[in-house]
């Protein structure tokens, strides 16, 4: 199979699911603000080397033009935490910084298409009777006879995972392409949505759509008044594994994303952050008492009992 049993149970454990009004991202924003840490926005770590005064030297760069920063600043730390998959971080590791480079694991390449249109979903496309109302959320599944092990064709003839009607909106007057009420849609798919698909799904005259839908970003039409595509490596394929990444890649170098190949959720990654924070404190206490120890099986990993399926 392409997913292990425990992750399957996690996917089915939706009872009591909640969200924050305005977006779950606010949880992590407030976590960061409550920490009183120095937060460097629009700044990325470009490389990690062995330090001279401390264990690690981090080189960073600004992601926006900034004349005031003509050089790449370097800061040294005794402990560092990499809280992103290394394979997507664009961070270069110096020689002998870690004992073993984490394995690259395959991620789902998810195409998210957000757009506005006065049109509604076509009942005909879904085999409904003329005039039948289409639900606000459409989820697809594969036919029983389809080979679901083929990662290149995991949605079958439907061509998408889901379509959601997010809200209804009325844009400010003065924009000819956005006159009247608009429906805001979101499509999840394994490949870019094509003009032919959009035409069939929403009963839009094909000749009114450009061959490349990305042209709608700059040139919206009366049928598609706003268009925003985004590609995410959204979550990993949770294949059954017998080994997993270490939490501590080297002495004082912690890696929360080792959890990704086991279970990939916000909650479990937050729990991993809690575990890493505890390990950092434990290591400092041991160092103060005259010991030096990297992560071993004897170190207590907290929170395991809190993982409920």
Which residue stretches match the model-derived regions?
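Mid-domain catalytic core of redox enzymes
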Residues: 46-199
